[in-house]
């Protein structure tokens, strides 16, 4: 996998790489839009799978081979399948769910404008020149120290950053996931009066004399069960003699 990303960089340069980038990004954008536009909840769960597959292709083009392989495993194998199981547990009908979409249009428009404003703000900060004099920096002398340092793989770099600089945030995210898991269990553990349940302790504590079942054997060799019950709820007085007589 380490040789896969450089191969993509070598073979796909210029127009070819831009074409592949457009081919992978366009279905991702359309699928992301269909996640919120699909009226069938099952389709809304299946569209993110296509988004994650396209995202893996984009990560391979960027040279992040480890992230490209771990993204489908985590997102498709865990999150998307979990969402699909939740939809199946809710017993949602396959028929399309009619809902007023325009009622959420103002809120979604405001969130979209905030998102685009943040994106333009980030891009403006990225285009700030390195020197305040705005001179041409191509004639400056510099030394590339990247080749003199031992190169790390994507996995080593990710592990070094995750468990050193971002260790606190890693623990916070794990606690958030733990709270979410416990909360999902607590939400499903609710009692309702519509379900018929049986009190096992009370059932076992009933008087066994009212449920005596005696197997008797007839003289002709046929076996049958005979249930004894008296008017007071107990067995008759002569059930022992009857059992001895058939034996």
Curated annotation (Swiss-Prot):
This enzyme's EC code(s): 7.1.1.2
GO MF annotation terms: NADH dehydrogenase (ubiquinone) activity
One Pfam assignment: Oxidored_q3
Keyword vocabulary terms for this entry: Electron transport, Membrane, Mitochondrion, NAD, Respiratory chain, Translocase, Transmembrane, Transmembrane helix, Transport, Ubiquinone
Gene3D superfamilies membership: NADH-ubiquinone/plastoquinone oxidoreductase chain 6, subunit NuoJ
InterPro entries assigned: NADH_UbQ/plastoQ_OxRdtase_su6, Nuo/plastoQ_OxRdtase_6_NuoJ
Regions annotated as coiled coil: none
Localization per record: Mitochondrion membrane
Family indicated by similarity: Belongs to the complex I subunit 6 family.
PANTHER family on file: NADH-UBIQUINONE OXIDOREDUCTASE CHAIN 6
Protein name: NADH-ubiquinone oxidoreductase chain 6
Gene: ND6
């Amino acid at each position: 996998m380490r040789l896969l990303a450089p191969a993509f960089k070598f073979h796909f340069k210029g127009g070819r790489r831009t074409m592949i980038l457009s081919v992978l990004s366009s279905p991702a954008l359309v699928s992301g839009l269909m996640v919120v536009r699909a009226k069938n909840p099952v389709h809304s769960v299946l569209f993110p799978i296509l988004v994650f597959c396209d995202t893996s292709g984009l990560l391979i083009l960027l040279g992040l081979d480890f992230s490209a392989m771990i993204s489908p495993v985590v997102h498709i194998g865990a999150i998307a399948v979990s969402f699909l199981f939740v939809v199946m547990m809710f017993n949602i009908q396959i028929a399309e769910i009619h809902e007023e979409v325009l009622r959420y249009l103002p809120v979604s428009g405001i969130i979209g404008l905030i998102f685009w404003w943040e994106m333009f703000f980030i891009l403006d900060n990225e285009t700030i020149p390195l020197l305040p004099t705005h001179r041409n920096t191509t004639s400056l002398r510099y030394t590339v120290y990247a080749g003199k340092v031992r190169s790390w793989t994507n996995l080593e770099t990710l592990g070094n950053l995750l468990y050193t600089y971002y260790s606190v945030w890693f623990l916070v995210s794990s606690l958030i996931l733990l709270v979410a898991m416990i909360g999902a269990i607590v939400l499903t553990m609710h009692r309702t009066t519509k379900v018929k349940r049986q009190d096992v302790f009370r059932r076992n504590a009933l008087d066994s004399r009212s449920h005596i079942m005696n197997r008797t054997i007839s003289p002709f060799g046929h076996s049958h069960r005979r249930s004894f019950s008296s008017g007071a709820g107990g067995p008759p007085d002569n059930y022992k003699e009857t059992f001895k007589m058939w034996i």
